[in-house]
């Protein structure tokens, strides 16, 4: 049969001429005896069942089809799949071959093995003309293939819009839409709408919905909404919801469309779909009260009385768009109708869609608008300062993530228990005159003239049907002409209590994109007074908690996602809310605030707890006064810092002290310094006296104010009636004369500190004194070590100190890189800034010394404040370590009288550390948090760099005298009180002054038993550093230091006289060795014109196995040291005095007290000549070093200033 195969190949290749030759040979039969059986078989089929006519139909060649049909080729021959030539012609899509086959009487409804007729193929591939031809030849559009699909199903599945239109225009349209030829119980049952929704064909869906297909038809997978949601077709979901699909229908797996999205989809589109589905759950259901139709409006909905209407949206022109489903006929109608003809019959949990919706006028006429009463009490003032800073910050609850949705509008989910009517703009709202009278709006921007108190919002299911939240927010915004943003707040899920938590980022997210409007709204938000709407007691369960928050619609959502109890709901985060589908910013904030309140209630905090509202101005001042002298502290709850750490006892008592006296608002030097710095740095700020604080008179207002959006650490307490036991600030008297202008270098460094202090804080606190009975200390509160609580919690009694907190905003922008560390000095508590100083302070101290400024030595006694005065120009000493480590060194205390006398004589520039061990520093200093370089002399560079020639000459002469006195250090009187072991006292050491010139110490001194104190100095209690250059030099043996090997070891056992003598000899030898080695690197800072003998106290610092002696930058003169004090003397720094005698130590023992040391005098004039020359050389070397370091500091200051600019 080779000829038949040749024919098939010729047809397959489309060779019409070869086919004609083949057919011509066998067209006329020859009358031969044996030739009649050799006729050509035109219906021959190959291995796949294809005949020549199959190939001709598939190729679409009409000539070949005609030739084969003339040869009587079988038109309905089937291949291996049961496909006929008409199937292939319909699949190929050319109408002429289809017509030829149909004229040849091809079967139009013959099905293949898979049940498909030619119309299935034509419809699936969108061949409109072929489909039309088949339909004209009575093809059955309701024919179902083995996949239970009709040609319409295939056309809808593949989005063949024209074919769908063609099929739906046929006489079998109703049957196609109803699926009468299908078995609904079949697992493969589906509808055209399901297939179109699954594949996202919007136009096909619109055609089907237009022609009335049942939108809620359920298959095994659910409704068409289930299919679209599962496949991530956001626009289809939206279209179906708009056309009234029931989002609560469950499939055979008991899943709603939202359940499917939550469980099976992770795409970005699923987020929008979740939102749409949640919105749809809050669609309003109404019942028609009377018939309605409008023949002149094609978009009007024909309504009969009693029809159930699903409200889809509320149009800006006042009409509502609704959907009516007729279960009997299986049809759905969508159109517009007036809201006056319906009544509400159901309120689903959730809210309306975030569309442009207005409150209909009839509801305002029928319902009473919630009023905002304005209380006009005689003499009442607004309870908030006019200068209150209301700008929100990043740390408010929920705002750390508000930037995520900027510009998105925060599409919404449930608004409390039911539907809130959204308002597009206030112009479309048709309030009646009587309603405007009831709704008392603010007479203008709330600027402090009246107390505008908004009553707490009671939430019940009927409130939001009247648009109560919308009306409240509208009345509030209308007071300052911002009513156009009502819809923004409502659609984002805000009510008035939650609006008070709004930050500028949140305003941007909800659509307030104009900076001026954001600023105005933020200002007015700060002046709102409204209950926080948070639980006042621990809820019973999750439902109770959500009900108190007014968000019970989320109970099911939270429960289904694993938050079934209060213990688990406290772990909610913003990410968790996003994951479970709560996207409305207002609801996120309220839930997270509710979690915070729940935690506070569980921890036993008072109502308000850590969510207390914080309102402060740009530089308000709150006075903090120490407890009374008797030490009695009021019984109040413990106060916490913004890190959650407990405040020191002094601050606890000060912040909770009653109104025993009015705190004077005297302008402090620190505030002047802040003002001067801000003028130079571009941060112009008003002083604390810019606005007087008005008295507050609140009537019936809940004082549990919510948290304000201000930087953490600025939790200031509202005064007078706002917070009990507050303190009112009075208008300030005229400011004292301004301080001298600051140098630019120090100013730049200070700006760096203000912007690089606390990474997560917007502002830094300035601490300064405001009292009149004691001298003030001006310091900068910087980062606490490790963000922990204060180290020394017990204040010193009978030392009244008033401190005030002022606020200065730091500059925005990325922080500059940290300065280079210059040393490895550290302590167990972390680096404390007491021992650091700026260039300005070093120079100022040396200038004062050069002019001869000193202390009057008649009655003053050196306290811990003097120890820290010059700490900026030297390393940390024992006294500083005791302050920074919270009193680890147990050292003697002075009496109250001595401290008060010395405090009264301190100059204004005296600076010290507070007794609370707060890491204070000097005013204007502590600008660069760095440690000194290992060389001991490299922190005095700025002092020498700014000295005048006269001061330099004084410096050289002082160096000469220093060498003379350092050699005779053993001859100086040293009084060391050593006692048996007893509990350590958390206090600072008392430094005793040196006796006057010519005075001789008594042969023996007796110390009473009650004056005894411990001296416990171990390496673990002191500051640890790497060995300095000086210390390395000490390791090389020298002739005078041959026996200088023992070290000071703390003794915990009773000491005998012999032991004491041996230990004192060791101390003396160590002092001498260190004095000789350090004389080349010590700075001079002594009064050159004083007539008394001035000494510089040196404090013992442990560094490894060695002991280093440090001296302060200021000399102190005074009488004999009092009993109970500790004094280590290194070398005197007198520059031009005549020293005729040097004390020499001797030892005596007292019967009633521990051994003490007295001294005799020794003439040392011959040592002056031998030391003078080497001293001058050392001074010159030191000056060169200081000049180099000064240049380095200048470069660093310029670099920091450039970074800040």
Curated annotation (Swiss-Prot):
The keyword Signal does not apply. The keyword Repeat applies. Signal peptide: none annotated. Residues 468-531, 537-601 form the SAM domain. Residues 666-687, 908-919 have a biased composition (Low complexity). Pfam families: Ank_2, Ank_4, Caskin-Pro-rich, Caskin-tail, SAM_1, SH3_2. Residues 377-411, 666-689, 784-964, 984-1054, 1132-1155 are annotated as: Disordered. Residues 1009-1037 have a biased composition (Basic and acidic residues). It comes from the Eukaryota. Keywords: ANK repeat, Repeat, SH3 domain. Coiled coil: none annotated. Residues 377-388, 398-411, 823-840, 942-959, 1042-1054, 1137-1155 have a biased composition (Polar residues). ANK repeats lie at residues 48-77, 81-110, 114-143, 147-176, 188-217, 220-249. The gene is caskin2. This is Caskin-2. It comes from Xenopus laevis. Residues 281-347 form the SH3 domain.
């Amino acid at each position: 049969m080779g000829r038949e195969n040749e024919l098939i190949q010729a047809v397959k290749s489309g060779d019409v001429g070869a086919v004609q030759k083949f057919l011509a040979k066998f067209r006329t039969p020859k009358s031969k005896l044996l030739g009649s059986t050799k006729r050509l078989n035109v219906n021959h089929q190959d291995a796949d069942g294809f005949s020549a006519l199959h190939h001709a139909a598939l190729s679409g060649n009409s000539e070949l089809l005609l030739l084969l049909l003339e040869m009587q080729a079988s038109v309905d021959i089937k291949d291996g799949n049961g496909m006929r030539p008409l199937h292939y012609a319909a699949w190929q899509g050319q109408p002429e071959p289809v017509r030829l086959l149909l004229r040849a009487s091809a079967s139009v409804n013959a099905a293949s093995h898979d049940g498909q007729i030619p119309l299935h193929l034509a419809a699936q591939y969108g061949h409109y003309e072929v489909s039309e031809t088949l339909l004209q030849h009575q093809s059955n559009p309701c024919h179902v293939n083995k996949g239970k699909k009709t040609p319409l199903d295939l056309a809808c599945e593949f989005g063949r819009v024209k074919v769908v239109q063609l099929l739906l225009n046929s006489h079998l349209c109703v049957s196609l839409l109803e699926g009468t030829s299908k078995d609904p119980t079949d697992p493969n049952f589906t509808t055209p709408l399901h297939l179109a929704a699954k594949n996202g064909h919007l136009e096909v869906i619109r055609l089907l919905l237009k022609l009335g297909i049942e939108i809620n038809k359920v298959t095994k997978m659910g409704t068409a909404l289930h299919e679209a949601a599962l496949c991530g077709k956001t626009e289809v979901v939206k279209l179906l919801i708009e056309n009234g699909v029931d989002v609560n229908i469950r499939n055979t797996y008991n899943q709603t469309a939202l359940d499917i999205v939550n469980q099976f989809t992770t795409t970005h589109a699923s987020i929008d779909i979740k939102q749409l589905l949640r919105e749809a759950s809050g669609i309003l259901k109404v019942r028609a009260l009377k018939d309605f139709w409008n023949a002149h409006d094609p978009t009007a909905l024909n309504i009969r009385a009693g029809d159930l209407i699903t409200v889809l949206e509320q149009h800006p022109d006042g009409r509502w768009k609704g959907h009516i489903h007729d279960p009997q006929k299986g049809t759905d109608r969508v159109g517009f109708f007036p809201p006056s003809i319906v009544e509400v019959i159901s309120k689903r949990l959730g809210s309306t869609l975030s569309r442009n919706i207005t409150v209909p006028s009839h509801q305002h006429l029928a319902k009473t608008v919630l009023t905002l009463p304005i209380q006009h009490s005689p003499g009442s003032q607004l309870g908030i300062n006019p200068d209150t800073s209301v700008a929100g910050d990043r740390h408010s609850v929920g705002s750390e993530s508000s930037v995520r949705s900027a510009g998105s509008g925060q599409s919404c989910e449930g608004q409390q228990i039911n539907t809130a009517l959204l308002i597009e703009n206030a112009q479309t709202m048709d309030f009646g005159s009587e309603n405007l009278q009831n709704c008392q709006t603010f007479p203008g921007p709330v600027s402090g003239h009246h107390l505008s108190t908004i009553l707490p919002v009671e939430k019940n299911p009927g409130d939001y049907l009247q648009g109560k939240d919308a009306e409240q927010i509208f009345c509030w915004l209308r007071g300052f002409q911002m009513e156009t943003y009502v819809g923004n707040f409502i659609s984002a899920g805000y009510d008035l209590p939650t609006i008070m938590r709004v930050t500028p980022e949140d305003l941007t997210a909800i659509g307030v994109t104009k900076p001026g409007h954001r600023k105005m709204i933020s200002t007015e938000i700060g002046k709102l007074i409204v209950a926080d709407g948070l639980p006042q007691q621990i809820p019973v369960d999750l439902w109770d908690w959500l009900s108190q928050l007014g968000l019970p619609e989320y109970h099911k959502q939270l429960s289904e996602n694993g938050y079934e109890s209060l213990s688990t709901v406290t772990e909610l985060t913003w990410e968790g809310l996003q994951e479970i589908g709560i996207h409305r910013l207002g609801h996120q904030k309220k839930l997270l605030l509710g979690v915070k309140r729940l935690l506070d209630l569980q921890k036993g905090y008072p109502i308000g707890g850590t969510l207390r509202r914080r309102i402060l101005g740009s530089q308000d001042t709150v006075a903090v006064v120490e407890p009374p002298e008797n030490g009695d502290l009021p019984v109040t709850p413990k106060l916490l810092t913004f890190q959650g750490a407990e405040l020191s006892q002094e601050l606890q008592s000060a912040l909770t002290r009653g109104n025993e006296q009015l705190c004077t608002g005297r302008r402090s030097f620190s505030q002047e310094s802040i003002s001067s710095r801000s003028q130079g740095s571009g941060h112009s700020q008003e002083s604390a006296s810019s606005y007087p604080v008005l008295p507050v008179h609140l009537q019936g207002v809940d004082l549990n104010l919510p948290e304000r959006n201000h930087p953490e650490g600025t939790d200031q307490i509202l005064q007078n009636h706002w917070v009990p036991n507050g303190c009112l600030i009075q208008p300030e008297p005229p400011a004292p004369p301004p301080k001298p202008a600051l140098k630019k270098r120090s100013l730049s460094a200070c700006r760096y500190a203000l912007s690089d202090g606390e990474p997560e804080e917007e502002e830094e606190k300035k601490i300064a004194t405001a009292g009149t009975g004691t001298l003030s200390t001006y310091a900068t509160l910087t980062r606490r070590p490790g963000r922990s609580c204060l180290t020394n919690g017990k204040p010193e009694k009978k030392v009244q100190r008033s401190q005030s907190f002022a606020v200065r905003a730091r500059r925005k922008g990325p922080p500059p890189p940290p300065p280079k560390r210059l040393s490895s000095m550290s302590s167990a508590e972390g680096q404390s800034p007491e021992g650091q100083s700026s260039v300005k302070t070093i120079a100022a101290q040396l200038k004062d010394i050069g002019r001869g400024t000193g202390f009057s030595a008649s009655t003053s006694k050196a306290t811990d404040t003097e120890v820290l005065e010059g700490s900026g120009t030297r390393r940390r000493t024992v006294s500083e370590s005791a302050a920074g480590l919270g009193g680890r060194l147990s050292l003697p205390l002075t009496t109250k009288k001595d401290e008060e006398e010395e405090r009264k004589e301190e100059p204004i520039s005296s600076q010290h550390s507070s007794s609370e061990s707060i890491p204070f520093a000097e005013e204007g200093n502590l600008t660069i948090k760095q440690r000194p370089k290992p060389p001991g002399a490299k922190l005095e560079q700025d002092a020498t760099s700014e000295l005048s020639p006269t001061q330099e000459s004084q410096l050289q002469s002082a160096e000469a005298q220093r060498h003379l006195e350092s050699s005779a250090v053993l001859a100086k009187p040293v009084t060391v009180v050593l006692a048996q072991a007893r509990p350590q006292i958390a206090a600072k050491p008392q430094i005793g002054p040196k006796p006057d010139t010519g005075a001789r110490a008594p042969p023996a001194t007796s110390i009473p038993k009650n004056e005894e104190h411990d001296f416990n100095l171990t390496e673990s209690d002191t500051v640890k550093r790497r060995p300095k250059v000086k210390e390395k030099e000490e390791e090389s043996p020298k002739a005078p230091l041959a026996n200088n090997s023992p070290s000071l070891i703390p003794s915990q056992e009773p000491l005998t006289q012999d032991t004491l003598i041996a230990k004192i000899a060791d101390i003396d030898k160590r002092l001498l060795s260190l004095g000789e080695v350090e004389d080349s690197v010590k700075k001079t800072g002594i009064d050159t014109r004083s007539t008394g003998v001035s000494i510089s106290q040196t404090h013992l610092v442990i560094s490894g196995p060695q002991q280093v002696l440090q001296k302060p930058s200021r000399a102190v003169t005074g009488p004999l040291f009092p009993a109970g004090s500790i004094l280590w003397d290194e070398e005197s720094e007198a520059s031009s005095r005549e020293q005729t005698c040097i004390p020499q130590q001797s030892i005596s023992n007292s019967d009633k007290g521990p051994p003490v040391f007295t001294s005799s005098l020794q003439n040392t004039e011959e040592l002056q000549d031998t030391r003078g020359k080497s001293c001058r050389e050392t001074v010159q070397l030191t000056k060169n070093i200081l000049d180099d370091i000064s240049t380095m500091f200048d470069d660093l200051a310029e670099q920091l200033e450039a970074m800040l600019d």
